[in-house]
């Protein structure tokens, strides 16, 4: 066995998925010429056009996602700068008003100081006399004195509309008095100060009332509109947002997460509160302030902040516990509920789903990985006690109705059931762009299961690998018989070719509920199918790893003895000429055993691979190729043939030629004659002819006609398969049920 294992080591191939970015690198180049590229693609076929469309759609999605990330990365800085500019503009306006007021005071003081009584003209005295007697001016001063008291009364009685009208009236009169100088500078500045003080008082009243939880929608909008009329729009908008925040915070007091409650219910209730508040705030902002960029930017910043806080609450009270326990369905449903509420805001121009994804995606990925790990560990535990006998699904299983298709061993049944449940859970992951990650994770789990199947083969490499990490996974029930070993391949091939791809089709369904949308479904299918086709191809390539290990193991069993000696040595051909002409030509023993083994496996495969005959044929083809290619590449064998102490004689050449013809004959009858097999046998024959020619004899003069070889091959197949010459009909195909004779009876016809 040590010799077999030493010869069976090979470097495993690694599958690397082609990244989309590599395929799109051409489009990202600064030197990309769109017109030249389109012209070069005008002659491509339909398949290439579809592939190009897929690449362009991927580029579009990647570009949109990159732009969104860039916007959100720089948005806080943009908002902060905009707000600073707005504040600066407000300060400049205040400074301008202050300078104007001070200029008026200075001019008034200058006029009073510079009056010279000695130089007062008669005209000035007359004008002063007229002004003193002007009753209108006295009434204005009286009004200016009483106006602050009138404002105080309106504010005390909370007659907001009348107060706003009074403020407007007062500001108009102040403006006129300032232009016409109908009031003294002291009275004018006193009046301006009184109006500003009362306006500030009213603004404080409105802001306080707006932030009360008892303030209803109409009252809130009226208060904010009044606050805006007072001339402080930025504060009014901030108060509006704070009011909505205070209201939903007050409503949240009755919402308390419980360790025994369903996380989805808590998430749904909290989502309703938060995103309804954001939606109403957006509606109020648009109705009162319009689409002014400064206010829209503040709304986006505020909504993003509330969404961040919401996501942290859901993460702490609903997602974290589910993810830690590997509850993928619970975690995915919580995330889906939140994203569903959040997506409704996109109609209002608020795209906040990326904010949720930033927090939800890592923790849902954690639940996804925990779920996959559980599938891997449970399947490995089942494999430790698997008897490797194909059975129908357990009674009561949801897959029992398709039992005729799903005959698997116990560990594969368990793996399939867990995968089906897994894909029931991952539907909501599509909205988080985790569909590809789910497929990749399941590929890793399936690859791990195939490794378990490989270790179940007697003398497998992995079983003796000291670097293999998980010691618990080394415990696996050995598949001792050929039927058990074929069951390993039946497990892997059925899972990779049918069951897993069929389950993965659930990812192609429209999870938004619009499954009957005939316009969207073809596009979704076109976009997702290439990824799933590539995924299925990778699954099947993983099965090839098990197939190679199976064929290598059986080829080594044929070629080597338990002690490490070879059944396929040069001596069996170079020594045959010592027996002289008295040789009963028949295929060599090792090729008789190969034929018998293939027949036994074909008989077993007929029951195990129902509906998958192509896989059975490819397996027999691979096993035959393994033996022939090993002989073709065995340098020690050819060194003995070409340079050994005894040259290859005519009878040895004839026997070697017969063996290769025999392989070609039964492979052709069994429908598994491949190009590689044909090439390998031809190469062996060519090497043998060349070695014989080196002795100075024409090889073709020593070889009988092809009919002689064909007759012996047909006779050998009939005898080895238990048929008599009188039995008409074709030799049983190795892909049909064959009752082959035992190897011991085959040895009676062997010759060296």
From Swiss-Prot:
Keywords: Cell membrane, Cell wall, Cytoplasm, Cytoskeleton, Exocytosis, Membrane, Protein transport, Secreted, Transport. Gene3D superfamilies: Exo84p, C-terminal helical domain (1.20.58.1220), Exo84p, N-terminal helical domain (1.20.58.1210). Coiled coil: none annotated. Its main location: cytoplasm. The keyword Secreted applies. It comes from the Eukaryota. Residues 733-752 have a biased composition (Low complexity). Belongs to the EXO84 family. The exocyst complex is composed of SEC3, SEC5, SEC6, SEC8, SEC10, EXO70A1 and EXO84B. Interacts with SEC6, SEC10, SEC15B and EXO70A1. Interacts with EXO70B1. Binds directly to B1L. This is Exocyst complex component EXO84B. The lineage of its organism: Eukaryota, Viridiplantae, Streptophyta, Embryophyta, Tracheophyta.
